[in-house]
């Protein structure tokens, strides 16, 4: 059995500061007026079958050919509220600053209208910034 940890690079104080901020957020108790929401996104290739899979035989799995046809890509937005055990997923055709801003707006307007402030934990992807919100909406 192994345990995995994110080991900061030597001399990277900025990394340690950010990591400690996130760990502090995760240790805070649940508060519905200040929910903790983790958000991420990923693009996925959409593939189709070139040859129909062979039907299942008793005791055997389905046989699927390795050849596939590419049907484009989609972007998956995931929002998780770990202290409540709640999640929400949306799929878009692309990954733009506006798509991210619209996802955040939907989260705030539709799923957390009662919150005073949402504590949002996310990575440093170029679209995940306040600038994206300014580009999508009037300040």
Protein language model features and the residues they cover:
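Conserved short alpha-helical interface segments
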Residues: 1-10, 35, 41-44
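Short hydrophobic/aromatic beta-strand element in the GNAT-like acyltransferase core
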Residues: 2-6, 76, 118
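Helix-centered, glycine/charged polyanion-binding patches within enzymatic domains
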Residues: 125-139
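Extended, low-complexity cationic-aromatic segments
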Residues: 19-105
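Acidic/histidine-rich, metal-coordinating catalytic segments
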Residues: 115-129
